[in-house]
Amino acid sequence: MSDTKPCVCLDGSCSCENTCRCSDCRCPTSKAGRCQKSCCSCCPAGCTNCANGCVCKGKASDKCSCCS
């Protein structure tokens, strides 16, 4: 059983739990199936939330951009 839980879309907004990947968080109402800004919370483990997405701790070159 995986620790990763799926993202749930409610009222056009994405709700992410634990370390679900942003690629799994696709709301039907969002353009081209992309994650909405409310999905910034679905960062991979070791990442911190930023205004324009998620940036990994440690390696500056390793970005986890959830909201690009």
Curated annotation (Swiss-Prot):
GO terms for MF: metal ion binding
Transmembrane regions: none
Keywords from the UniProt entry: Metal-binding, Metal-thiolate cluster
Entry coiled-coil feature ranges: none
Annotated residues for binding of a divalent metal cation 4: 39-40, 50, 54
Recorded superkingdom: Eukaryota
Family matches, as Pfam families: Metallothio (PF00131)
Binding site for a divalent metal cation 7: 56, 64, 66-67
Annotated residues for binding of a divalent metal cation 2: 9, 14, 16, 27
Binding site for a divalent metal cation 6: 43, 47, 50, 67
InterPro entries: Metalthion_dom_sf, Metalthion_dom_sf_vert, Metalthion_vert
Record: residues binding a divalent metal cation 5: 40, 42-43, 56
Binding site for a divalent metal cation 3: 16, 20, 25, 35
Binding site for a divalent metal cation 1: 7, 9, 22, 25
Family designation: Belongs to the metallothionein superfamily. Type 1 family.
Function, as annotated: Metallothioneins have a high content of cysteine residues that bind various heavy metals.
UniProt domain comment: Class I metallothioneins contain 2 metal-binding domains: four divalent ions are chelated within cluster A of the alpha domain and are coordinated via cysteinyl thiolate bridges to 11 cysteine ligands. Cluster B, the corresponding region within the beta domain, can ligate three divalent ions to 9 cysteines.
Protein name: Metallothionein
Protein's organism: Scyliorhinus torazame
